[in-house]
């Protein structure tokens, strides 16, 4: 079993309807079967969610509107809303002081299409809190799924981009205060060199705690306004040793820490984007379940998101079928696919999803 160096030390069945209760997890709750992105694309193409075997949609917050929400509810599906937590592109246009700063004291360049933000920027956090409250004021959601909960980096590519951030004076000041360390150096680059040379382990832990604080604070807002709604987190599905422990070192992600604060973990199992075989989807899901359920008593749900999207390269219908099956294996209690456009543009993939969602059954405990 793989283990995290930072505190990290089960069957899918597509079978006869006669021997099991359809669409139930081992705990007897409904197995989630969804589509991520802008699922209204399916409606515009003439499909109904319920006719495709779906019981959930995972809609980007920018695509959420009353017409879509009402239609989804009328068709009997749950509505989970993606929330772009630390995606900074929009905010940085008018607030350059929130730009993530690298160890040289420079603005860290965009990582491919993504630009993160300084997670300690109080104005940005207040901005995101207002946005979340606005969603919850207007929609009774089944859950909020936090996205981009990581320090500035890019992992949705075969070759990741892994800068060192953020060393702005705000971050180094808060780090020094929070850990009772005296940070030596006059310039940002001098402070960064001192931190990485003398307090690297403490620095990595502090960065992870900053992200966990975001999850806690967003979760508090959600539970205060809609106590029954689930708090989910999308996150990079690397094993702890991948890319020289970059999941923790660079991105600041600790899956066990997330599991302590969220109701649902959704590993982003985009096999083509990450250059992995289809079997990796099932291997990671199994590893994650063993890891988080050993470390914490509360059972956090696992709902993987898998790739149908043709980028990079082509994901064949059979390949899509394989990752759907792998991602639905225990301990998964739900699955979603990316993206809606892939289904509409390739009817074969639509049929793959429909067939799996219509037949999927998870054995009850003891069966």
Describe each region flagged by the PLM.
Residues 183-185, 191-315:
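Glycoside hydrolase catalytic-domain groove-lining segments
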Residues 80-139, 156, 187-200:
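Active-site-adjacent "subsite" loops/lids of carbohydrate-active enzymes
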């Amino acid at each position: 079993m793989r283990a995290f160096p930072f505190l990290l030390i089960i069957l899918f069945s597509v079978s006869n309807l006669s021997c099991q209760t359809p669409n139930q997890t081992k705990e007897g709750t409904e197995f989630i079967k969804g589509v991520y992105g802008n699922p209204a694309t399916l409606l515009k193409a003439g499909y109904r969610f319920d006719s495709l075997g779906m019981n959930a949609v995972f809609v980007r917050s920018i695509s959420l509107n009353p017409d879509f929400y009402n239609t989804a509810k009328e068709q009997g599906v749950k509505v989970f809303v993606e929330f772009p937590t630390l995606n900074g592109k929009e905010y940085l246009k008018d607030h350059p002081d929130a730009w993530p700063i690298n160890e040289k004291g420079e603005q860290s360049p965009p990582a491919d299409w993504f630009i993160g933000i300084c997670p300690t920027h109080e104005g940005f956090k207040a901005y995101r809190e207002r946005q979340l409250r606005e969603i919850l004021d207007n929609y009774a959601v089944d859950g909020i799924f936090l996205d981009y909960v990581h320090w500035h980096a890019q992992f949705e590519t075969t070759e990741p981009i892994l800068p060192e951030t953020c060393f702005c004076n705000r971050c180094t000041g808060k780090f020094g205060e929070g850990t009772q360390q005296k940070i030596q150096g006059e310039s940002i680059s001098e402070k960064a060199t001192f931190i990485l040379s003398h307090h690297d382990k403490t620095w990595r832990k502090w960065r992870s705690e900053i992200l966990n604080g975001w999850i806690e604070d967003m979760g508090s807002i959600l539970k205060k306004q809609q106590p029954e709604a689930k708090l989910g987190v999308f996150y990079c599905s690397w094993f702890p040793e991948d890319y020289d422990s970059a999941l923790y070192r660079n991105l600041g992600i600790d899956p066990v820490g997330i599991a302590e604060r969220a109701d649902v973990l959704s590993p982003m199992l985009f096999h083509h984007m990450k250059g992995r075989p289809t079997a990796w989807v099932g291997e990671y899901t199994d590893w994650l379940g063993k890891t988080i359920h050993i470390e914490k008593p509360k059972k956090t749900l696992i709902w993987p998101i898998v790739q149908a999207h043709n980028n990079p390269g082509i994901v064949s219908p059979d390949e899509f079928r394989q990752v759907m099956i792998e991602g639905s294996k225990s301990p998964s209690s739900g699955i979603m696919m990316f993206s809606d456009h892939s289904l509409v543009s390739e009817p074969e993939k639509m049929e793959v999803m429909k067939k799996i969602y219509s037949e999927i059954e998870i054995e009850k405990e003891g069966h």
